[in-house]
Amino acid sequence: ETVHRVRLWGTDQAIAVSRSTADQMRAKWGARGVELVYNGVDIPEVHAAVEQQRVPAEGGPRILSLSRLSPEKGIDVLLDAFAQLRADYPQAHLEIAGSGDLASELQAQAQRLNLGDSVTFSGFVNPIEAMGRSDMIVQLSVWENCSYTLLDAKAAGLKTVATAVGGNPEILGADELVDRQSATLTQDVLQAMRAQLQKGKPEPFTWISNEQMAAQTVDIYARVLRGGR
């Protein structure tokens, strides 16, 4: 905590990638002069790249988790919710991409839930290819700043469910979010997945581009170099 505070007080300007991050920087470390510059995403390019990898669905909905296999990512909750989702969608499939300390534990959980080949642990993957064979991304992190995974998923036109933490509510709509602190988190995730799967095609996504992000950052640097804030 002290190190972060000293670093921030020794800078001429701080940049946060979400309003939530900016608020935390001010509240926890007394940061001054914090400006918001969201992570950018080039929506047409991402959408086109994913469409080039698009694999038509042959069965039920295809759910994707694209994160580290570590406790703060909530993949155990996703497995429990997915096991119940199969009552509505027996042909549903869950791909858990990524690696981490919980790999063996999560695989054992999938076995206990009798999920069989409805779950694939795919390890390290090309995220564009993984999104091309998926219909929905679920991300149940304890904390996020401005998630590139969610930005890319929205740009690609995938359905999304995520925890209402960090910058996630600045990217997603209320019906795509669940309360990470809820005592009924598994059921909340299940209901959110059901609701998203029952909806039609997602609304067009708008966000700042990489070029806009770079321009905003350059503008901040230029003002600092001129001696202004």
Model-predicted regions and their roles:
Residues 1-14:
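Membrane-proximal helix-turn-helix segments that form the acceptor-binding/catalytic region
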Residues 20, 40:
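Carbohydrate-associated surface elements
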Residues 61-84, 94, 101-107:
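A conserved mid-protein helix/loop that constitutes part of the nucleotide-sugar donor-binding site
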Residues 102-105, 116-124, 130:
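Active-site donor-binding acidic/aromatic loop of nucleotide-activated sugar
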Residues 142:
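Aromatic "clamp/platform" in nucleotide-sugar-dependent glycosyltransferases that forms part
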Residues 159-162:
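Short hydrophobic beta-strand element within catalytic cores of glycosyltransferases
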Residues 184, 197-226:
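A charged, aromatic-enriched C-terminal amphipathic alpha-helix characteristic of glycosyltransferases
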